[in-house]
Amino acid sequence: MKWTFIAFLGLVISIFVYFDINEIPIYNLKVAYKFITGVSDYEQYEGLAEKLGYSESDKLLIIHADDIGLSKSVNDASFEALKKGLVNSGSIMMTCDYILDVGEFAIKNPEIDLGLHLTVTSEWRDYKWDGVSNSSSIPSLIDKKGHLFENKKKFTWNANPDDLKRELQAQINLAKSLGINPTHIDSHEGALFFDQKLFKAYLEVGEENKLPVFVPKPVAVHFDKSFPKPKNVVIVDNMYMALPDLEFSKWDEYYINVLNNLGPGLNEIIVHLGYDDKEMQNITVDHPNYGSEWRNLDLDVISSQEFRKAIEDNNIKLVTWREIQNIIY
Protein backbone atom coordinates (compact mmCIF):
# COMPACT_ATOMS: atom_id res chain seq x y z
CA MET A 1 0.00 0.00 0.00
CA LYS A 2 2.82 2.36 0.96
CA TRP A 3 4.69 1.77 -2.30
CA THR A 4 1.48 2.15 -4.32
CA PHE A 5 0.93 5.55 -2.74
CA ILE A 6 4.55 6.58 -3.37
CA ALA A 7 4.26 5.50 -7.01
CA PHE A 8 1.01 7.44 -7.38
CA LEU A 9 2.56 10.51 -5.76
CA GLY A 10 5.55 10.24 -8.09
CA LEU A 11 3.23 10.07 -11.10
CA VAL A 12 1.30 13.14 -9.96
CA ILE A 13 4.51 15.10 -9.42
CA SER A 14 5.78 14.03 -12.86
CA ILE A 15 2.57 15.22 -14.50
CA PHE A 16 2.73 18.65 -12.93
CA VAL A 17 6.45 19.00 -13.67
CA TYR A 18 5.65 18.18 -17.32
CA PHE A 19 2.90 20.79 -17.31
CA ASP A 20 5.22 23.38 -15.78
CA ILE A 21 7.99 22.77 -18.33
CA ASN A 22 5.50 23.01 -21.20
CA GLU A 23 3.75 26.08 -19.78
CA ILE A 24 0.44 24.31 -19.23
CA PRO A 25 -0.87 25.90 -16.01
CA ILE A 26 -3.31 23.20 -14.92
CA TYR A 27 -3.36 22.76 -11.14
CA ASN A 28 -6.49 20.63 -10.79
CA LEU A 29 -5.69 16.89 -10.68
CA LYS A 30 -9.01 15.84 -12.21
CA VAL A 31 -8.63 18.23 -15.14
CA ALA A 32 -4.97 17.24 -15.51
CA TYR A 33 -5.92 13.57 -15.80
CA LYS A 34 -8.61 14.29 -18.40
CA PHE A 35 -6.25 16.56 -20.33
CA ILE A 36 -3.59 13.85 -20.57
CA THR A 37 -5.99 11.02 -21.42
CA GLY A 38 -8.16 13.12 -23.72
CA VAL A 39 -11.30 12.06 -21.85
CA SER A 40 -14.14 14.55 -22.29
CA ASP A 41 -17.88 14.49 -21.76
CA TYR A 42 -19.75 16.78 -24.13
CA GLU A 43 -21.96 16.80 -27.21
CA GLN A 44 -21.13 18.97 -30.21
CA TYR A 45 -23.56 21.74 -31.13
CA GLU A 46 -26.42 19.81 -32.70
CA GLY A 47 -26.58 19.84 -36.49
CA LEU A 48 -23.76 22.36 -36.92
CA ALA A 49 -22.60 21.14 -40.33
CA GLU A 50 -26.14 20.91 -41.69
CA LYS A 51 -27.03 24.36 -40.42
CA LEU A 52 -23.95 25.70 -42.19
CA GLY A 53 -25.19 24.07 -45.40
CA TYR A 54 -22.96 20.99 -45.37
CA SER A 55 -23.06 17.37 -44.23
CA GLU A 56 -21.49 15.73 -41.19
CA SER A 57 -18.94 14.07 -43.47
CA ASP A 58 -17.69 17.39 -44.88
CA LYS A 59 -14.35 18.87 -43.91
CA LEU A 60 -15.08 22.35 -42.59
CA LEU A 61 -12.19 24.75 -42.09
CA ILE A 62 -11.58 28.21 -40.65
CA ILE A 63 -8.20 29.73 -41.58
CA HIS A 64 -7.61 32.19 -38.78
CA ALA A 65 -5.06 34.98 -38.32
CA ASP A 66 -4.20 35.76 -34.69
CA ASP A 67 -2.63 38.87 -33.12
CA ILE A 68 -4.15 41.57 -35.36
CA GLY A 69 -3.43 44.96 -33.79
CA LEU A 70 -0.05 43.90 -32.40
CA SER A 71 1.99 45.98 -34.87
CA LYS A 72 1.91 47.70 -38.24
CA SER A 73 3.70 44.71 -39.75
CA VAL A 74 1.09 42.28 -38.43
CA ASN A 75 -1.76 44.55 -39.51
CA ASP A 76 -0.44 45.06 -43.03
CA ALA A 77 0.10 41.34 -43.58
CA SER A 78 -3.21 40.34 -41.98
CA PHE A 79 -5.29 42.97 -43.80
CA GLU A 80 -3.85 41.90 -47.14
CA ALA A 81 -4.46 38.22 -46.38
CA LEU A 82 -8.04 38.89 -45.30
CA LYS A 83 -8.83 40.99 -48.37
CA LYS A 84 -7.36 38.36 -50.70
CA GLY A 85 -9.14 35.50 -48.93
CA LEU A 86 -5.89 33.80 -47.94
CA VAL A 87 -7.37 33.65 -44.46
CA ASN A 88 -11.09 33.95 -43.85
CA SER A 89 -11.09 35.00 -40.20
CA GLY A 90 -8.93 36.83 -37.69
CA SER A 91 -8.89 38.20 -34.17
CA ILE A 92 -7.69 41.45 -32.62
CA MET A 93 -5.56 42.19 -29.55
CA MET A 94 -7.36 45.19 -28.06
CA THR A 95 -4.52 45.93 -25.59
CA CYS A 96 -2.00 46.79 -28.32
CA ASP A 97 -0.89 49.99 -30.02
CA TYR A 98 -2.29 49.50 -33.52
CA ILE A 99 -5.98 48.93 -32.86
CA LEU A 100 -7.10 52.25 -34.37
CA ASP A 101 -5.92 51.01 -37.76
CA VAL A 102 -7.95 47.84 -37.21
CA GLY A 103 -11.04 49.91 -36.44
CA GLU A 104 -10.65 51.80 -39.72
CA PHE A 105 -10.13 48.54 -41.60
CA ALA A 106 -13.23 46.97 -40.01
CA ILE A 107 -15.42 49.95 -40.92
CA LYS A 108 -14.22 49.88 -44.55
CA ASN A 109 -14.57 46.09 -44.78
CA PRO A 110 -17.65 45.16 -42.71
CA GLU A 111 -18.02 41.79 -44.45
CA ILE A 112 -14.68 40.53 -43.11
CA ASP A 113 -14.82 38.10 -40.20
CA LEU A 114 -13.06 39.72 -37.22
CA GLY A 115 -13.20 38.54 -33.63
CA LEU A 116 -11.33 39.50 -30.48
CA HIS A 117 -8.13 37.83 -29.34
CA LEU A 118 -8.85 38.44 -25.66
CA THR A 119 -5.52 39.32 -24.12
CA VAL A 120 -4.48 38.83 -20.49
CA THR A 121 -0.72 38.28 -20.89
CA SER A 122 2.10 40.52 -22.10
CA GLU A 123 4.88 38.23 -23.27
CA TRP A 124 7.37 40.36 -25.23
CA ARG A 125 10.51 41.61 -23.47
CA ASP A 126 10.52 45.19 -24.78
CA TYR A 127 6.87 45.68 -25.80
CA LYS A 128 4.54 45.63 -22.82
CA TRP A 129 0.91 46.53 -22.23
CA ASP A 130 -1.61 46.63 -19.44
CA GLY A 131 -5.33 45.99 -19.68
CA VAL A 132 -7.99 48.11 -21.32
CA SER A 133 -9.54 48.67 -17.88
CA ASN A 134 -7.99 50.99 -15.35
CA SER A 135 -5.33 48.89 -13.64
CA SER A 136 -6.70 49.73 -10.19
CA SER A 137 -9.96 48.00 -11.13
CA ILE A 138 -8.25 44.73 -12.17
CA PRO A 139 -5.43 44.37 -9.61
CA SER A 140 -5.23 40.57 -9.83
CA LEU A 141 -4.36 40.80 -13.54
CA ILE A 142 -1.51 43.31 -13.18
CA ASP A 143 2.11 42.63 -12.19
CA LYS A 144 4.34 44.81 -10.00
CA LYS A 145 5.54 46.78 -13.03
CA GLY A 146 2.00 47.72 -14.04
CA HIS A 147 1.70 45.31 -16.97
CA LEU A 148 -0.34 42.22 -17.63
CA PHE A 149 1.56 39.14 -16.45
CA GLU A 150 4.28 37.89 -18.79
CA ASN A 151 3.06 34.31 -19.02
CA LYS A 152 0.05 32.04 -18.58
CA LYS A 153 1.31 30.51 -15.35
CA LYS A 154 1.56 33.82 -13.49
CA PHE A 155 -1.78 34.94 -14.88
CA THR A 156 -3.54 31.71 -13.89
CA TRP A 157 -2.00 31.75 -10.42
CA ASN A 158 -3.03 35.34 -9.66
CA ALA A 159 -6.20 36.19 -11.60
CA ASN A 160 -9.65 36.21 -10.07
CA PRO A 161 -12.80 35.75 -12.18
CA ASP A 162 -14.39 39.10 -11.31
CA ASP A 163 -11.37 41.10 -12.44
CA LEU A 164 -11.12 38.92 -15.52
CA LYS A 165 -14.73 39.43 -16.58
CA ARG A 166 -14.34 43.16 -16.06
CA GLU A 167 -11.31 43.27 -18.36
CA LEU A 168 -12.73 40.97 -21.03
CA GLN A 169 -15.89 43.06 -21.20
CA ALA A 170 -13.80 46.23 -21.45
CA GLN A 171 -11.95 44.79 -24.44
CA ILE A 172 -15.25 43.98 -26.15
CA ASN A 173 -16.63 47.44 -25.39
CA LEU A 174 -13.52 49.14 -26.77
CA ALA A 175 -13.74 47.14 -29.99
CA LYS A 176 -17.35 48.15 -30.51
CA SER A 177 -16.53 51.80 -29.80
CA LEU A 178 -14.01 51.70 -32.68
CA GLY A 179 -16.59 50.39 -35.13
CA ILE A 180 -15.56 46.74 -34.87
CA ASN A 181 -18.48 44.31 -34.85
CA PRO A 182 -16.85 41.18 -33.41
CA THR A 183 -17.96 37.77 -34.64
CA HIS A 184 -16.31 35.66 -31.94
CA ILE A 185 -13.81 35.65 -29.09
CA ASP A 186 -10.71 33.56 -28.51
CA SER A 187 -7.78 33.59 -26.10
CA HIS A 188 -4.29 35.00 -26.65
CA GLU A 189 -1.75 32.29 -25.78
CA GLY A 190 -4.69 30.12 -24.65
CA ALA A 191 -4.35 31.74 -21.23
CA LEU A 192 -8.07 31.43 -20.46
CA PHE A 193 -8.23 27.68 -21.05
CA PHE A 194 -6.60 26.13 -17.98
CA ASP A 195 -8.26 27.19 -14.73
CA GLN A 196 -11.92 26.21 -14.60
CA LYS A 197 -13.14 29.37 -12.86
CA LEU A 198 -11.35 31.59 -15.37
CA PHE A 199 -12.57 29.44 -18.26
CA LYS A 200 -16.15 29.83 -17.00
CA ALA A 201 -15.72 33.61 -16.92
CA TYR A 202 -14.59 33.49 -20.55
CA LEU A 203 -17.65 31.45 -21.56
CA GLU A 204 -19.97 33.75 -19.63
CA VAL A 205 -18.63 36.86 -21.36
CA GLY A 206 -19.18 35.22 -24.73
CA GLU A 207 -22.77 34.28 -23.94
CA GLU A 208 -23.59 37.67 -22.43
CA ASN A 209 -22.38 39.38 -25.61
CA LYS A 210 -23.79 36.79 -28.05
CA LEU A 211 -20.30 35.97 -29.31
CA PRO A 212 -19.22 32.42 -30.21
CA VAL A 213 -16.36 31.32 -27.99
CA PHE A 214 -13.35 29.47 -29.39
CA VAL A 215 -13.04 26.20 -27.49
CA PRO A 216 -10.70 23.61 -29.05
CA LYS A 217 -11.41 19.96 -28.28
CA PRO A 218 -8.56 19.51 -25.73
CA VAL A 219 -10.09 22.29 -23.62
CA ALA A 220 -13.47 20.52 -23.58
CA VAL A 221 -12.04 18.29 -20.82
CA HIS A 222 -13.47 20.89 -18.44
CA PHE A 223 -17.00 19.79 -19.28
CA ASP A 224 -18.62 17.05 -17.22
CA LYS A 225 -21.81 16.44 -15.25
CA SER A 226 -20.90 19.10 -12.71
CA PHE A 227 -19.96 21.58 -15.47
CA PRO A 228 -21.98 20.72 -18.59
CA LYS A 229 -21.10 22.34 -21.89
CA PRO A 230 -23.31 25.41 -22.45
CA LYS A 231 -25.66 24.77 -25.38
CA ASN A 232 -24.29 27.65 -27.48
CA VAL A 233 -20.65 26.56 -27.24
CA VAL A 234 -19.34 25.10 -30.50
CA ILE A 235 -16.30 22.87 -30.05
CA VAL A 236 -13.55 23.08 -32.67
CA ASP A 237 -12.96 19.41 -33.39
CA ASN A 238 -9.37 19.88 -34.55
CA MET A 239 -7.06 22.87 -34.17
CA TYR A 240 -3.78 23.15 -36.05
CA MET A 241 -0.93 25.59 -35.51
CA ALA A 242 2.81 25.54 -36.07
CA LEU A 243 4.52 24.81 -32.74
CA PRO A 244 8.00 25.73 -31.45
CA ASP A 245 9.52 22.34 -32.25
CA LEU A 246 8.76 22.73 -35.98
CA GLU A 247 11.84 23.46 -38.07
CA PHE A 248 11.53 26.44 -40.40
CA SER A 249 12.56 24.20 -43.31
CA LYS A 250 9.47 22.03 -42.66
CA TRP A 251 6.94 24.89 -42.68
CA ASP A 252 5.32 24.18 -46.07
CA GLU A 253 5.31 20.45 -45.46
CA TYR A 254 3.54 20.83 -42.11
CA TYR A 255 0.63 22.90 -43.42
CA ILE A 256 0.16 20.85 -46.59
CA ASN A 257 0.08 17.67 -44.50
CA VAL A 258 -2.59 19.24 -42.30
CA LEU A 259 -4.77 19.93 -45.35
CA ASN A 260 -4.14 16.52 -46.89
CA ASN A 261 -5.12 14.76 -43.66
CA LEU A 262 -7.96 17.00 -42.54
CA GLY A 263 -10.91 15.08 -41.13
CA PRO A 264 -14.65 15.75 -41.11
CA GLY A 265 -16.05 18.24 -38.63
CA LEU A 266 -15.07 21.76 -37.66
CA ASN A 267 -11.35 22.44 -38.06
CA GLU A 268 -9.30 25.59 -37.54
CA ILE A 269 -5.81 26.44 -38.75
CA ILE A 270 -4.31 29.30 -36.75
CA VAL A 271 -1.59 31.41 -38.33
CA HIS A 272 0.39 34.39 -37.08
CA LEU A 273 1.06 36.77 -39.94
CA GLY A 274 3.60 39.55 -40.32
CA TYR A 275 6.67 40.62 -42.24
CA ASP A 276 10.22 39.81 -41.25
CA ASP A 277 11.02 43.51 -40.97
CA LYS A 278 12.78 45.75 -38.45
CA GLU A 279 9.61 46.45 -36.50
CA MET A 280 8.80 42.78 -35.92
CA GLN A 281 12.44 41.92 -35.28
CA ASN A 282 12.55 44.55 -32.53
CA ILE A 283 9.28 43.40 -30.97
CA THR A 284 10.21 39.72 -30.99
CA VAL A 285 13.87 40.07 -30.00
CA ASP A 286 15.13 36.97 -28.13
CA HIS A 287 11.83 35.26 -28.95
CA PRO A 288 12.09 33.18 -32.15
CA ASN A 289 8.82 31.39 -31.41
CA TYR A 290 6.08 33.44 -33.10
CA GLY A 291 8.84 35.84 -34.12
CA SER A 292 9.30 37.87 -37.29
CA GLU A 293 10.63 35.04 -39.47
CA TRP A 294 7.93 32.69 -38.17
CA ARG A 295 5.19 35.16 -39.16
CA ASN A 296 6.63 35.75 -42.62
CA LEU A 297 6.78 31.98 -43.15
CA ASP A 298 3.12 31.64 -42.20
CA LEU A 299 2.28 34.38 -44.70
CA ASP A 300 4.35 32.72 -47.43
CA VAL A 301 2.65 29.36 -46.92
CA ILE A 302 -0.95 30.59 -47.05
CA SER A 303 -0.06 32.71 -50.11
CA SER A 304 1.31 29.72 -52.01
CA GLN A 305 -0.44 28.00 -54.90
CA GLU A 306 0.33 24.67 -53.26
CA PHE A 307 -1.67 25.62 -50.17
CA ARG A 308 -4.68 26.78 -52.20
CA LYS A 309 -4.52 23.68 -54.40
CA ALA A 310 -4.50 21.39 -51.35
CA ILE A 311 -7.71 23.04 -50.13
CA GLU A 312 -9.35 22.42 -53.49
CA ASP A 313 -7.97 18.92 -54.01
CA ASN A 314 -9.19 17.79 -50.58
CA ASN A 315 -12.68 19.26 -51.11
CA ILE A 316 -12.34 21.39 -47.99
CA LYS A 317 -15.22 23.76 -47.23
CA LEU A 318 -14.22 27.14 -45.81
CA VAL A 319 -16.52 28.50 -43.11
CA THR A 320 -16.32 31.53 -40.83
CA TRP A 321 -17.11 32.46 -37.26
CA ARG A 322 -19.66 34.95 -38.59
CA GLU A 323 -21.62 32.06 -40.12
CA ILE A 324 -21.45 30.20 -36.81
CA GLN A 325 -22.54 33.32 -34.92
CA ASN A 326 -25.55 33.71 -37.21
CA ILE A 327 -26.59 30.12 -36.47
CA ILE A 328 -26.30 30.11 -32.70
CA TYR A 329 -27.42 33.67 -31.98
Sequence positions of predicted segments:
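N-terminal pre-catalytic segment of deacetylase/amide-hydrolase enzymes
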Residues: 3-62
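Active-site beta->alpha N-cap acidic-glycine motif
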Residues: 46-125
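Acidic (Asp/Glu)-rich catalytic clusters
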Residues: 53, 78-84, 101-113, 130-143, ...
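Active-site beta-loop-alpha junctions enriched in small/polar residues
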Residues: 68, 95, 117-123, 188-190, ...
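Active-site gating loops and adjacent loop-to-helix segments of metal-dependent hydrolytic enzymes
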Residues: 129-154, 285-291
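Catalytic domains of cell-wall/extracellular-matrix polysaccharide-remodeling enzymes
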Residues: 158-234, 239, 244-251, 260, ...
